[in-house]
Amino acid sequence: MLFGLVSRHYVEFSQDTLISGGKFKGCTASAGQIACVEAQADGAYLLPVWRGEMHLTDEIGAYHPFADWETAEPGDIIGGFTTFYGKQQGHGKAAAREHNISEGVKRIDGVAVEREETFSFNALCAPYRHSNDYELAPNVSTDGFGYGGGVCQVTTTLYNAALTLPLQIEEWALHSKQGAVYVPQFFDAAVGNYSDFTFVNLLPYGVQIHASAQNGVLTVLFCRAEEDSQ
């Protein structure tokens, strides 16, 4: 099974497209949304979905390679990753889980990380409490629920996007040996009030994070920042 640990292309959907794969029951990406994909030697494209994969056709959208980070110009997309979510993860609280995903995405979208700067997810998103606009939703814990449940899917997507670039992971934790169903085993990234996800930007320029979550499609992209710190 091929899963996009290094996604070198992305697709911008030109039409509504049903996404399914692995044990994921499906969602529908809308025209204009972006997902990170794997380009094959034969010219085909694979979309990693929940430890499975979906073969994509040329008709569903336009495919673009990520810019090489060594030669990228300001504004170029240099890396990214996509995961998928749906009602089957909600255990009766799907709307709350989706709210928390949207809350996490909102807080990291547009954030710039200068060269040699350390990014901290919790600095932007914690604490995971009702008073910080999070809702009670399923998570990986003793009782299976907690405020902010679902935010770890944002962290996991960000983590896998970071793995495609010279970004040094400083702090990272797994949920458990089984991991999260929406990525390969050992490629999830857990956060909580006492655990963070951090990385250092080792690129020779600043980067900007672009994150979006809509219709069950969660994508995190890294772009070369428009203005570099000297």
Over which residues does each language-model region extend?
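Well-ordered beta-sheet/strand-loop patches within structured domains
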Residues: 3-8, 12-19, 25, 29, ...
